[in-house]
């Protein structure tokens, strides 16, 4: 897994070794960001169920102003911090080790784009939308 474009282009990202998490494939991520390419710059991003943080990091690399990362898994939080450090983007990030409901209640600014990719096994897709 890697950052596809922008300031951190080519940066290799770590992912979680877990059966409950599955990273978004690079080709899927690339397609998403091709659609969003003109809507990322200077935006505030919320990456819920962030896992490795790859979606929020890609957005920051492409010019997003700030990204909030939310995951309840301790290993995910550790990996997100590592990946932000590796991509030199940690100063634009806020990380919540909380449930998505708790994290949303702590936000004090307008969010422009939300990435929502929960593990299907949790059964929260409908509720989290």
Q: Which ranges hold each PLM region?
A:
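Class I S-adenosyl-L-methionine-dependent methyltransferase catalytic core
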Residues: 1-129
């Amino acid at each position: 897994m890697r950052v596809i474009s922008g300031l951190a282009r080519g940066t290799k990202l770590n992912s979680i070794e877990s059966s409950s998490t599955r990273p978004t494939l690079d080709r899927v991520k690339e397609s998403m960001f091709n659609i969003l390419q003109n809507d990322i710059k200077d935006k505030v991003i919320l990456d819920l169920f962030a896992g490795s943080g790859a979606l929020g990091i890609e957005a920051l690399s492409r010019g997003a102003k700030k990204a909030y990362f939310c995951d309840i898994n301790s290993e995910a939080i550790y990996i997100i911090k590592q990946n932000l450090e590796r991509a030199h983007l940690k100063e634009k990030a806020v990380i919540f080790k909380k449930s998505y409901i708790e994290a949303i209640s702590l936000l004090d600014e307008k969010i422009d784009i939300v990435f929502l990719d929960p593990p299907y096994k949790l059964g929260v897709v409908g509720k989290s939308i």
